[in-house]
Amino acid sequence: MIDQNLLRTNLDDVANALKVKRGFTLDVESVKALEEKRKALQVKTETLQAERNARSKNIGAAKARGEDISALLAEVDNMGNELNEAKVALDQVQAEIRELLLSVPNLPADEVPLGKDDTENLEVSRWGEPRQFDFEVKDHVALGEALNGLDFAAGVKLTASRFVVMKGKLARLHRALSQFMLDLHTEQHGYVETNVPFLVNHDTLFGTGQLPKFGEDLFHTQPLTGQDPNETQRPFSLIPTAEVPVTNLVRDEIIDENSLPLRYTAHTPCFRSEAGSYGRDTRGLIRMHQFEKVEMVQIVAPEKSMEALEELTGHAEKVLQLLGLPYRKVLLCTGDMGFGSAKTYDLEVWLPAQNTYREISSCSNMWDFQARRMSARCKAKGDKKTRLVHTLNGSGLAVGRTLVAVLENYQNADGSITVPEVLRPYMGGVEVITA
């Protein structure tokens, strides 16, 4: 959620920036009307409170003089009722302002390139050279099915399309990838491993920005409307990414600045309805309703967040480098960024069968956008005031897409797969996967 003070002091500039950079039209007149109403009610509330306090003191003085105070008591009582009504009205207006702000995307950092979609993203760097094959390249679906390791028909039978059953050595390779990633991040990059719920409440989804805007992209235990408020029927949602529960660990917390940065990692399944993705990537593991990911989250002091973004992105890059997978680093333009991001790098891995780079990690600095929604703050020792932390998140990596990249880049002419060296300890020493 963007800073409400920005709207109070620079409304027209903010509205213009949102329009130009985000394609978002802010209802300026509604904001102005609500802000005027809020200011009037704020003044009224403060005035009534001051008058009520003054009258209350008069009651004490009159009582000490032995005077009849019944009229004063009635006056203070009426003033109290009026004050309560004003407070209720003020709370209502503030709730309306918050509701409006929840739909407003984050403002991009100045260095983010202006653009309408992914065709205007900026390539920053490349690592590794795509392998030159002397045989006809197969895609991961053909390779996985020939190895009896990917069973998409079983996924359809058990659930629906965009689900898969992994078996045998490919299931183990998938597990090896996630274990390797976790070990790297915890042992070399300084992250604390967390094991978090896969079902979360709606406060958690509001905190990281999935709700209210992206409810249709989630799987819910109950419809978002008409929910039963009873404790036994509380509505939960399956997590679309571990970013959601892990980042919310600091919700409603005041963190000692000396303990920052906080670095967390988690390996979880992720669940996405893929609303709006009909017809896209219908073949294989690229776009699934259920997939696994190793997520990295950092909670940092505001002045450290841009430096932290470079560090976090480097941690994701290290996974690809150790696996020997060619990739490129891309700075997303304003039209391709996520709703809550101020700056995002995508890492795109080379897929030989598609003869192109495909996203395998997205690393974002959210500034204080999520922290404001979560009321996540920090305070230095000796300071009376708190300030909002900055939050960052990144895939380190998407496990299924990494499996795709390993299968395609390490395939052999006979359909076998050479196991990358760093994964062999997790595979019981297996060097080549055969049918």
From Swiss-Prot:
Enzyme Commission no: 6.1.1.11
InterPro entries: aa-tRNA-synt_IIb, aa-tRNA-synth_II, aa-tRNA-synth_II/BPL/LPL, Ser-tRNA-ligase_type_1, Ser-tRNA-synth_1_N, SerRS_1_N_sf, SerRS_core, tRNA-bd_arm
Residues engaged in binding ATP: R272, S273, E274, E359, I360, S361, S362
Location(s), subcellular: Cytoplasm
Annotated GO biological process: selenocysteine biosynthetic process; seryl-tRNA aminoacylation
Main location: cytoplasm
Function (record text): Catalyzes the attachment of serine to tRNA(Ser). Is also able to aminoacylate tRNA(Sec) with serine, to form the misacylated tRNA L-seryl-tRNA(Sec), which will be further converted into selenocysteinyl-tRNA(Sec).
Family, similarity comment: Belongs to the class-II aminoacyl-tRNA synthetase family. Type-1 seryl-tRNA synthetase subfamily.
Matches recorded under HAMAP family: Ser_tRNA_synth_type1
Name of the featured protein: Serine--tRNA ligase
Gene expressing this chain: serS
